[in-house]
Amino acid sequence: MRVRALRASARIAGAATLLLAAFATGPRADREQVLQDLARIGAEHRDSTAWDRRRSVLRREFLKGAGLWPLPKRGPYSVLRHSFRQYDGYTVENVAIETLPGFYCTGNLYRPLPALAAAKTRGPGILCPHGHFKPLGRFRPEHQIRCAHLAQRGATVFSYSMVGWQDSMQTTHDDPIVLALQTWNSLKALDFLCSLPDVDSERVGMTGASGGGTQTLYLALLDDRVKASAPVVIVYPWSAPEGCCRCEGGMPVMQAAATNCIEFAAAIAPRPQLILSVGQDPTHDFPEVGFPFVRSAYDAYRAGHCVESVHLPKEAHDFGPSKRAAVYSFLARNLGFEDRPENLSRITIEQPSQMEVFSASHPLPSKAVHGPAAVSHAFAAMRSGQK
Protein backbone atom coordinates (compact mmCIF):
# COMPACT_ATOMS: atom_id res chain seq x y z
CA MET A 1 0.00 0.00 0.00
CA ARG A 2 2.88 2.32 0.82
CA VAL A 3 4.39 1.83 -2.65
CA ARG A 4 1.04 2.49 -4.35
CA ALA A 5 0.57 5.65 -2.30
CA LEU A 6 4.03 6.95 -3.19
CA ARG A 7 3.50 6.26 -6.90
CA ALA A 8 0.11 7.95 -6.81
CA SER A 9 1.61 10.93 -4.97
CA ALA A 10 4.28 11.21 -7.67
CA ARG A 11 1.63 11.22 -10.41
CA ILE A 12 -0.36 13.87 -8.57
CA ALA A 13 2.74 15.99 -8.01
CA GLY A 14 3.44 15.98 -11.75
CA ALA A 15 -0.15 16.92 -12.52
CA ALA A 16 0.01 19.68 -9.92
CA THR A 17 3.07 21.16 -11.61
CA LEU A 18 1.18 21.37 -14.90
CA LEU A 19 -1.88 22.77 -13.15
CA LEU A 20 0.08 25.54 -11.45
CA ALA A 21 1.89 26.37 -14.68
CA ALA A 22 -1.45 26.81 -16.44
CA PHE A 23 -2.86 28.67 -13.46
CA ALA A 24 -0.10 31.29 -13.60
CA THR A 25 -0.41 32.11 -17.31
CA GLY A 26 -2.41 34.87 -18.99
CA PRO A 27 -5.86 36.24 -18.19
CA ARG A 28 -8.72 33.79 -17.93
CA ALA A 29 -11.33 33.67 -20.66
CA ASP A 30 -14.11 34.42 -18.17
CA ARG A 31 -12.43 37.44 -16.57
CA GLU A 32 -14.41 40.14 -18.38
CA GLN A 33 -17.69 38.31 -17.80
CA VAL A 34 -16.89 38.07 -14.09
CA LEU A 35 -16.18 41.80 -13.90
CA GLN A 36 -19.47 42.55 -15.68
CA ASP A 37 -21.31 40.25 -13.27
CA LEU A 38 -19.73 41.98 -10.29
CA ALA A 39 -20.92 45.37 -11.52
CA ARG A 40 -24.45 44.03 -11.91
CA ILE A 41 -24.47 42.23 -8.55
CA GLY A 42 -23.07 45.26 -6.77
CA ALA A 43 -25.81 47.48 -8.17
CA GLU A 44 -28.48 45.00 -7.04
CA HIS A 45 -27.14 44.40 -3.50
CA ARG A 46 -26.58 47.58 -1.57
CA ASP A 47 -27.74 46.69 1.93
CA SER A 48 -27.38 43.84 4.40
CA THR A 49 -30.87 42.49 3.74
CA ALA A 50 -30.10 42.09 0.04
CA TRP A 51 -26.80 40.38 0.87
CA ASP A 52 -28.52 38.02 3.31
CA ARG A 53 -30.88 36.95 0.52
CA ARG A 54 -28.05 36.62 -1.97
CA ARG A 55 -25.99 34.47 0.42
CA SER A 56 -28.95 32.11 0.81
CA VAL A 57 -29.18 31.79 -2.97
CA LEU A 58 -25.44 31.17 -3.33
CA ARG A 59 -25.49 28.48 -0.66
CA ARG A 60 -28.49 26.72 -2.13
CA GLU A 61 -27.19 26.77 -5.70
CA PHE A 62 -23.71 25.67 -4.61
CA LEU A 63 -25.12 22.69 -2.73
CA LYS A 64 -27.42 21.81 -5.62
CA GLY A 65 -24.50 21.91 -8.03
CA ALA A 66 -22.47 19.68 -5.72
CA GLY A 67 -25.29 17.17 -5.30
CA LEU A 68 -25.63 18.08 -1.63
CA TRP A 69 -29.07 19.73 -1.65
CA PRO A 70 -30.88 19.42 0.60
CA LEU A 71 -27.84 19.23 2.85
CA PRO A 72 -27.78 15.70 4.30
CA LYS A 73 -27.98 15.29 8.05
CA ARG A 74 -24.59 14.79 9.63
CA GLY A 75 -25.13 12.16 12.29
CA PRO A 76 -22.61 10.29 14.44
CA TYR A 77 -19.35 9.38 12.76
CA SER A 78 -16.36 7.24 13.63
CA VAL A 79 -12.91 8.69 14.21
CA LEU A 80 -9.64 6.76 14.08
CA ARG A 81 -6.67 8.19 15.98
CA HIS A 82 -3.18 6.85 16.51
CA SER A 83 0.55 7.60 16.79
CA PHE A 84 0.50 10.39 19.39
CA ARG A 85 3.71 12.47 19.36
CA GLN A 86 4.79 15.23 21.74
CA TYR A 87 7.06 18.10 20.70
CA ASP A 88 8.04 21.54 21.97
CA GLY A 89 4.75 23.15 22.98
CA TYR A 90 2.45 20.98 20.89
CA THR A 91 1.38 17.43 20.07
CA VAL A 92 0.45 15.65 16.84
CA GLU A 93 -1.84 12.68 16.15
CA ASN A 94 -2.85 10.92 12.96
CA VAL A 95 -6.62 11.11 12.49
CA ALA A 96 -9.17 9.73 10.03
CA ILE A 97 -12.83 10.75 10.04
CA GLU A 98 -15.36 8.43 8.41
CA THR A 99 -17.23 11.00 6.32
CA LEU A 100 -19.18 8.46 4.22
CA PRO A 101 -19.85 4.78 4.88
CA GLY A 102 -16.39 3.28 4.44
CA PHE A 103 -14.79 6.53 3.19
CA TYR A 104 -12.30 8.52 5.25
CA CYS A 105 -10.95 12.05 5.45
CA THR A 106 -7.31 11.74 6.54
CA GLY A 107 -5.32 14.29 8.47
CA ASN A 108 -3.25 15.31 11.45
CA LEU A 109 -4.47 16.89 14.66
CA TYR A 110 -2.14 19.45 16.23
CA ARG A 111 -2.87 20.49 19.80
CA PRO A 112 -1.23 22.74 22.37
CA LEU A 113 0.38 20.92 25.25
CA PRO A 114 -1.86 20.69 28.33
CA ALA A 115 0.25 23.21 30.22
CA LEU A 116 -0.43 25.80 27.54
CA ALA A 117 -4.05 24.81 26.96
CA ALA A 118 -4.77 25.00 30.69
CA ALA A 119 -4.56 28.80 30.58
CA LYS A 120 -8.06 28.73 29.08
CA THR A 121 -10.57 25.94 29.39
CA ARG A 122 -11.27 26.12 25.67
CA GLY A 123 -9.20 27.61 22.91
CA PRO A 124 -9.57 28.38 19.23
CA GLY A 125 -9.84 25.72 16.53
CA ILE A 126 -8.41 26.13 13.04
CA LEU A 127 -8.91 24.06 9.88
CA CYS A 128 -5.89 23.92 7.55
CA PRO A 129 -6.55 22.38 4.12
CA HIS A 130 -3.66 22.27 1.65
CA GLY A 131 -3.43 23.28 -1.99
CA HIS A 132 -2.08 21.72 -5.17
CA PHE A 133 1.53 22.19 -4.15
CA LYS A 134 4.32 19.89 -5.33
CA PRO A 135 5.01 17.59 -3.63
CA LEU A 136 3.31 16.13 -0.59
CA GLY A 137 0.38 18.44 0.22
CA ARG A 138 -0.21 18.45 3.97
CA PHE A 139 3.15 16.72 4.51
CA ARG A 140 5.07 19.74 3.13
CA PRO A 141 7.40 21.40 5.66
CA GLU A 142 5.75 24.83 5.31
CA HIS A 143 2.34 23.28 5.97
CA GLN A 144 3.64 21.52 9.06
CA ILE A 145 5.23 24.77 10.25
CA ARG A 146 1.91 26.63 9.99
CA CYS A 147 0.01 23.98 11.93
CA ALA A 148 2.66 23.51 14.61
CA HIS A 149 3.07 27.25 15.18
CA LEU A 150 -0.67 27.79 15.58
CA ALA A 151 -0.80 24.92 18.07
CA GLN A 152 2.08 26.45 20.01
CA ARG A 153 0.02 29.62 20.23
CA GLY A 154 -2.86 27.72 21.83
CA ALA A 155 -5.02 26.63 18.88
CA THR A 156 -6.22 23.13 18.08
CA VAL A 157 -5.50 22.61 14.39
CA PHE A 158 -6.84 19.96 12.03
CA SER A 159 -4.84 19.60 8.83
CA TYR A 160 -6.50 17.34 6.28
CA SER A 161 -5.77 15.99 2.81
CA MET A 162 -7.52 16.65 -0.44
CA VAL A 163 -9.21 13.59 -1.87
CA GLY A 164 -6.70 11.49 -3.80
CA TRP A 165 -3.65 13.02 -2.11
CA GLN A 166 -1.24 11.54 0.45
CA ASP A 167 -3.00 8.76 2.36
CA SER A 168 -6.46 9.65 0.99
CA MET A 169 -6.24 7.06 -1.78
CA GLN A 170 -9.70 5.48 -1.87
CA THR A 171 -10.43 7.35 -5.09
CA THR A 172 -8.50 9.67 -7.38
CA HIS A 173 -8.26 13.44 -7.36
CA ASP A 174 -9.93 13.52 -10.78
CA ASP A 175 -12.98 11.63 -9.53
CA PRO A 176 -16.06 13.23 -11.18
CA ILE A 177 -17.53 14.06 -7.75
CA VAL A 178 -14.27 15.15 -6.08
CA LEU A 179 -15.65 18.66 -5.44
CA ALA A 180 -18.62 17.22 -3.55
CA LEU A 181 -16.40 14.80 -1.64
CA GLN A 182 -14.02 17.55 -0.55
CA THR A 183 -16.82 19.89 0.42
CA TRP A 184 -18.45 17.13 2.46
CA ASN A 185 -15.08 16.27 4.03
CA SER A 186 -14.65 19.93 5.02
CA LEU A 187 -18.09 20.01 6.63
CA LYS A 188 -17.33 16.83 8.56
CA ALA A 189 -13.87 18.11 9.50
CA LEU A 190 -15.58 21.20 10.93
CA ASP A 191 -18.00 18.98 12.86
CA PHE A 192 -15.04 17.05 14.27
CA LEU A 193 -13.10 20.16 15.25
CA CYS A 194 -16.09 21.77 16.96
CA SER A 195 -16.81 18.54 18.87
CA LEU A 196 -13.44 18.48 20.63
CA PRO A 197 -13.74 19.37 24.32
CA ASP A 198 -10.88 21.86 24.25
CA VAL A 199 -12.20 23.84 21.25
CA ASP A 200 -14.40 26.90 21.64
CA SER A 201 -16.86 26.56 18.76
CA GLU A 202 -17.30 30.35 18.74
CA ARG A 203 -13.60 30.77 17.90
CA VAL A 204 -13.11 28.63 14.81
CA GLY A 205 -11.06 29.76 11.83
CA MET A 206 -9.82 28.39 8.53
CA THR A 207 -6.96 29.15 6.18
CA GLY A 208 -5.42 27.62 3.07
CA ALA A 209 -3.58 28.64 -0.08
CA SER A 210 -4.41 28.00 -3.74
CA GLY A 211 -6.72 24.96 -3.76
CA GLY A 212 -6.72 25.13 0.04
CA GLY A 213 -7.86 28.73 -0.33
CA THR A 214 -10.71 27.55 -2.54
CA GLN A 215 -11.76 25.05 0.12
CA THR A 216 -11.56 27.87 2.68
CA LEU A 217 -13.81 30.09 0.57
CA TYR A 218 -16.31 27.33 -0.05
CA LEU A 219 -16.67 26.26 3.58
CA ALA A 220 -16.76 29.82 4.94
CA LEU A 221 -19.52 30.61 2.45
CA LEU A 222 -21.53 27.52 3.41
CA ASP A 223 -21.13 27.42 7.19
CA ASP A 224 -21.37 30.29 9.67
CA ARG A 225 -19.38 28.29 12.22
CA VAL A 226 -16.25 29.47 10.40
CA LYS A 227 -15.87 32.71 12.33
CA ALA A 228 -12.69 33.96 10.64
CA SER A 229 -11.22 32.89 7.30
CA ALA A 230 -8.06 33.64 5.35
CA PRO A 231 -8.01 32.45 1.72
CA VAL A 232 -4.50 32.87 0.32
CA VAL A 233 -3.54 33.43 -3.36
CA ILE A 234 -6.88 32.34 -4.81
CA VAL A 235 -9.33 35.28 -4.91
CA TYR A 236 -9.40 36.90 -8.36
CA PRO A 237 -11.92 37.13 -11.23
CA TRP A 238 -12.73 33.49 -12.01
CA SER A 239 -15.76 31.28 -12.22
CA ALA A 240 -15.73 27.51 -12.49
CA PRO A 241 -15.07 25.35 -14.38
CA GLU A 242 -12.69 26.83 -16.99
CA GLY A 243 -9.07 26.60 -15.88
CA CYS A 244 -9.84 24.94 -12.55
CA CYS A 245 -9.03 21.58 -11.07
CA ARG A 246 -12.07 19.31 -10.79
CA CYS A 247 -11.98 19.78 -7.02
CA GLU A 248 -12.69 23.49 -7.55
CA GLY A 249 -14.85 23.55 -10.65
CA GLY A 250 -15.70 20.01 -11.70
CA MET A 251 -19.33 20.42 -10.64
CA PRO A 252 -21.65 23.37 -11.43
CA VAL A 253 -21.50 25.19 -8.10
CA MET A 254 -21.28 28.69 -9.60
CA GLN A 255 -23.19 28.58 -12.87
CA ALA A 256 -26.83 28.58 -11.76
CA ALA A 257 -26.37 31.66 -9.61
CA ALA A 258 -24.08 33.33 -12.21
CA THR A 259 -21.53 33.85 -9.48
CA ASN A 260 -17.75 33.78 -9.12
CA CYS A 261 -14.88 33.56 -6.68
CA ILE A 262 -14.91 37.24 -5.73
CA GLU A 263 -18.63 37.20 -4.93
CA PHE A 264 -18.10 34.13 -2.76
CA ALA A 265 -15.57 36.13 -0.74
CA ALA A 266 -18.01 39.05 -0.47
CA ALA A 267 -20.87 36.79 0.68
CA ILE A 268 -18.85 35.76 3.74
CA ALA A 269 -19.57 39.24 5.16
CA PRO A 270 -19.78 40.31 7.92
CA ARG A 271 -17.54 37.58 9.42
CA PRO A 272 -13.84 38.54 9.62
CA GLN A 273 -11.84 37.70 6.51
CA LEU A 274 -8.28 38.28 5.31
CA ILE A 275 -7.69 37.97 1.56
CA LEU A 276 -4.05 37.66 0.59
CA SER A 277 -2.84 38.34 -2.96
CA VAL A 278 0.54 38.55 -4.68
CA GLY A 279 2.11 40.16 -7.73
CA GLN A 280 3.22 37.01 -9.53
CA ASP A 281 0.03 35.01 -10.01
CA PRO A 282 -3.52 35.77 -11.20
CA THR A 283 -4.36 37.53 -7.91
CA HIS A 284 -1.97 40.33 -8.94
CA ASP A 285 -4.68 42.97 -9.39
CA PHE A 286 -7.13 41.81 -6.71
CA PRO A 287 -6.69 45.03 -4.67
CA GLU A 288 -7.98 47.03 -7.66
CA VAL A 289 -10.53 44.73 -9.34
CA GLY A 290 -11.77 42.59 -6.45
CA PHE A 291 -11.33 44.14 -3.05
CA PRO A 292 -13.60 47.17 -3.60
CA PHE A 293 -16.48 44.80 -4.37
CA VAL A 294 -15.78 42.62 -1.32
CA ARG A 295 -15.43 45.70 0.87
CA SER A 296 -18.77 47.05 -0.37
CA ALA A 297 -20.52 43.91 0.92
CA TYR A 298 -18.91 44.36 4.33
CA ASP A 299 -19.82 48.05 4.30
CA ALA A 300 -23.45 47.02 3.78
CA TYR A 301 -23.22 45.46 7.26
CA ARG A 302 -21.21 48.41 8.62
CA ALA A 303 -18.40 45.91 9.05
CA GLY A 304 -15.76 47.28 6.72
CA HIS A 305 -13.23 46.90 9.52
CA CYS A 306 -13.77 43.12 9.45
CA VAL A 307 -12.26 42.53 6.01
CA GLU A 308 -8.60 43.00 5.13
CA SER A 309 -6.55 42.81 1.97
CA VAL A 310 -2.82 42.11 2.17
CA HIS A 311 -0.99 42.38 -1.14
CA LEU A 312 2.62 41.28 -1.61
CA PRO A 313 3.61 42.55 -5.08
CA LYS A 314 6.99 40.79 -5.27
CA GLU A 315 5.81 37.39 -4.11
CA ALA A 316 4.61 34.25 -5.89
CA HIS A 317 1.93 31.57 -5.58
CA ASP A 318 2.73 29.88 -2.26
CA PHE A 319 2.12 30.05 1.50
CA GLY A 320 5.56 31.34 2.44
CA PRO A 321 6.78 33.02 5.66
CA SER A 322 5.47 36.54 5.01
CA LYS A 323 2.05 35.20 4.08
CA ARG A 324 1.95 32.99 7.15
CA ALA A 325 2.92 35.95 9.36
CA ALA A 326 0.00 38.01 8.01
CA VAL A 327 -2.40 35.12 8.57
CA TYR A 328 -1.12 34.48 12.11
CA SER A 329 -1.69 38.13 13.03
CA PHE A 330 -5.20 38.13 11.55
CA LEU A 331 -6.25 34.89 13.25
CA ALA A 332 -4.74 35.96 16.57
CA ARG A 333 -6.75 39.18 16.56
CA ASN A 334 -10.01 37.52 15.58
CA LEU A 335 -9.81 34.21 17.46
CA GLY A 336 -8.19 35.51 20.62
CA PHE A 337 -4.67 34.17 21.00
CA GLU A 338 -1.24 35.74 21.33
CA ASP A 339 0.53 36.60 18.09
CA ARG A 340 4.23 35.77 18.06
CA PRO A 341 6.71 35.13 15.23
CA GLU A 342 7.54 31.60 14.19
CA ASN A 343 10.46 29.99 15.97
CA LEU A 344 11.58 27.27 13.59
CA SER A 345 14.01 25.86 16.14
CA ARG A 346 10.98 24.79 18.20
CA ILE A 347 9.17 23.04 15.34
CA THR A 348 9.85 19.45 14.34
CA ILE A 349 9.43 18.63 10.65
CA GLU A 350 8.10 15.09 10.44
CA GLN A 351 8.59 12.55 7.70
CA PRO A 352 5.52 11.64 5.63
CA SER A 353 5.67 8.09 6.96
CA GLN A 354 5.10 9.44 10.49
CA MET A 355 2.07 11.45 9.40
CA GLU A 356 0.19 8.85 7.37
CA VAL A 357 -3.06 7.66 8.87
CA PHE A 358 -3.20 4.60 6.64
CA SER A 359 -0.10 2.58 5.83
CA ALA A 360 1.17 -0.98 5.94
CA SER A 361 1.25 -0.82 9.74
CA HIS A 362 -2.14 0.94 9.96
CA PRO A 363 -4.26 -0.45 7.10
CA LEU A 364 -7.63 0.86 6.04
CA PRO A 365 -10.55 -0.76 7.89
CA SER A 366 -12.00 -3.81 6.21
CA LYS A 367 -15.22 -1.93 5.40
CA ALA A 368 -13.36 0.72 3.40
CA VAL A 369 -14.59 1.36 -0.13
CA HIS A 370 -12.20 1.55 -3.08
CA GLY A 371 -12.45 3.22 -6.47
CA PRO A 372 -14.69 5.93 -7.96
CA ALA A 373 -17.70 3.63 -8.43
CA ALA A 374 -17.70 2.37 -4.84
CA VAL A 375 -17.11 5.86 -3.45
CA SER A 376 -19.94 7.24 -5.59
CA HIS A 377 -22.20 4.51 -4.22
CA ALA A 378 -21.21 5.45 -0.65
CA PHE A 379 -21.97 9.10 -1.45
CA ALA A 380 -25.39 8.14 -2.81
CA ALA A 381 -26.05 5.97 0.25
CA MET A 382 -25.24 8.87 2.55
CA ARG A 383 -27.55 11.14 0.60
CA SER A 384 -30.41 8.65 0.76
CA GLY A 385 -29.87 7.90 4.44
CA GLN A 386 -28.87 4.28 3.82
CA LYS A 387 -26.30 2.54 5.97
Question: Where are the regions a protein language model picked out?
Answer:
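Mobile cap/lid helix-loop segments that gate and shape the active-site cleft of serine hydrolases
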Residues: 225-271, 278-291, 297-303
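Loop/turn elements at helix/coil->beta-strand transitions in domains of secreted/extracellular proteins
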Residues: 122-124, 153-156, 200-203, 224-228, ...
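Glycine-rich nucleophile elbow surrounding the catalytic serine of serine-hydrolase chemistry
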Residues: 208-218
